[in-house]
């Protein structure tokens, strides 16, 4: 399973990328707005930190604008993935991007039917929003399982990128449900390293080692 970081915070990205565990990055207009920086500059800097896919979202809602913005974003770096909303216009743009060899991440997916259309349009990634579905009383993980079954039935190449991840349990459940990737907020990514029994066990080992008076070096 590939793990992407959902952030535009370059300092945080550098820190976590140093672990060698970050396979890519996703961004969105909300994260760009919070950064207070120029979008193209942020995307270019992120692409210089990670070699994997970096999703950058178009702001337009009509096909013409999405195509123009997507082409400009794709020109920033070879690892840019153009992120488009799962709308009729977005899927028309996705088909054109596919024909042009531009990778796409179709976002805001809330149903398996939508995911089917995105795959038929040639999307590189589909982003089902797990946490937001849970907020509305649905089971976000059920959606991943449904998409996985459909994609496997018809040998679609589109990868399932679990989004709107809120907890480390979401990451585990998405992996079990067959997601190819998950995009994770920095705080949740940090939480993946931790378990109270790991810390407790480490402290015990260190205490026992100290009693030996030995040094490995």
Curated annotation (Swiss-Prot):
One of the record's GO cellular component terms: cytoplasm
Reactions performed catalytically: D-sedoheptulose 7-phosphate + D-glyceraldehyde 3-phosphate = D-erythrose 4-phosphate + beta-D-fructose 6-phosphate
Subcellular location: Cytoplasm
Catalytic site positions: 83
Protein name: Probable transaldolase
E.C. number(s) listed in UniProt: 2.2.1.2
Keywords, sorted A to Z: Cytoplasm, Pentose shunt, Schiff base, Transferase
NCBIfam families: fsa_talC_mipB
Family label: Belongs to the transaldolase family. Type 3B subfamily.
Pfam families documented for this protein: TAL_FSA (PF00923)
InterPro entries, alphabetized: Aldolase_TIM, TAL/FSA, Transaldolase_3B, Transaldolase_3B/F6P_aldolase, Transaldolase_AS, TSA/FSA_arc/bac
Function, as annotated: Transaldolase is important for the balance of metabolites in the pentose-phosphate pathway.
This protein's pathway: Carbohydrate degradation; pentose phosphate pathway; D-glyceraldehyde 3-phosphate and beta-D-fructose 6-phosphate from D-ribose 5-phosphate and D-xylulose 5-phosphate (non-oxidative stage): step 2/3
MF-aspect GO terms: aldehyde-lyase activity; transaldolase activity
Iron-sulfur keyword on record: no
Top-rank taxon: Bacteria
Keyword Disulfide bond listed: no
GO biological process: carbohydrate metabolic process; pentose-phosphate shunt
